[in-house]
A protein has these predicted regions:
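Bacterial N-terminal signal peptides
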Residues: 1-12
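Boundary at the C-terminal end of the N-terminal hydrophobic targeting segment
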Residues: 11, 16-19, 23
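Tandem repeat scaffolds
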Residues: 20-275
Length: 275
């Protein structure tokens, strides 16, 4: 319940054995402290119920599969190419973290803050991102196929990302705290693959979906206000009760096969190619 309310309201050198060493920074700020797996586990154990401070640590390339991060502070952490399949990152703060190419398949990212995080080319297949803040994050080329996404992705870059069969649809039976849905307002999904994705009630207002694959996607009740769907494939997509106010379908394929177009809101204000 706490997570639901929070989202509703939010809008290197090799380490020396046994010693923490300073790794070369990836950004022009505080150098990161390189940790090996035993050192990381020691820090997590030392927290003893508190919030582990792993900010500015370098964990790049480590095998962290299944590890419980205990709601750690991982701001500006380096986790590029880390193997984190099935890891528990519940309620962690990964603001400005670097997770380029990381394997986060089936990881628990519920309640996690990933604001401005670098997740380009990351594997998030089957991951859970419920009540997750992913604002302005870099997810270019990331794989979120089959992931559960009820999060805040305003201004995120998902160009070329894979979201095939992703479940980003609102749960009609779990709205006691207000509308809980995936928010892609102003996000860049150019060329993204959302084939068969559940996008029920998702908010794509002002988002760029140019050349995106939306075949058989469920966009019922979705907000597509001023969304750019130029040259997108919308074959078989469900749009009944979706808000199409000034949505641009110019050059889109499969428009004639949209399901429920006659029931869409503001259909007359949408932009379609002339017959």
């Amino acid at each position: 319940v706490t997570l639901l309310l929070a989202v509703a309201l939010l809008v290197a050198p090799a380490p020396v054995a046994g010693a923490e060493v300073v790794a070369q920074p990836q950004a022009a700020d505080t150098p990161a402290v390189r940790l090996d797996l035993p050192q990381l586990k020691a820090r997590l154990a030392k927290a003893a119920g508190g919030v582990p401070d792993l900010s500015n640590t370098d964990l790049s390339g480590l095998d962290l599969a299944g590890l419980d991060f205990k709601a750690a502070n991982l701001t500006k952490a380096r986790l590029a190419d880390a193997r984190m399949a099935g890891a528990n990152l519940f309620s962690c703060d990964l603001t400005d973290a670097v997770l380029t190419g990381a394997d986060l398949s089936h990881a628990n990212l519920d309640g996690t803050v990933l604001r401005r995080a670098h997740l380009d080319r990351a594997n998030l297949q089957g991951a859970s991102l419920f009540a997750t803040i992913i604002e302005a994050a870099d997810l270019r080329g990331a794989d979120l196929s089959g992931a559960r996404i009820i999060g805040y992705l305003r201004s995120a870059n998902l160009s070329g990302a894979k979201l095939r069969d992703a479940n980003a649809g609102a749960d009609p039976g779990n709205q006691s705290m207000g509308v809980m849905r995936a928010t892609f307002v102003g996000a860049d999904l150019t060329g993204a693959d959302l084939t068969g994705a559940n996008l029920f009630k998702a908010d794509f207002s002002h988002a760029t979906l140019a050349s995106a694959k939306l075949a058989n996607a469920d966009l019922r009740n979705a907000e597509l206000v001023q969304a750019d769907l130029t040259k997108a494939d919308v074959t078989g997509a469900k749009v009944s009760k979706a808000n199409l106010d000034e949505a641009d379908f110019s050059g889109a394929t499969g428009v004639a096969r949209l399901v429920g177009l006659g029931e869409a809101r503001n259909r007359d204000k949408a932009i379609f190619d002339a017959n």
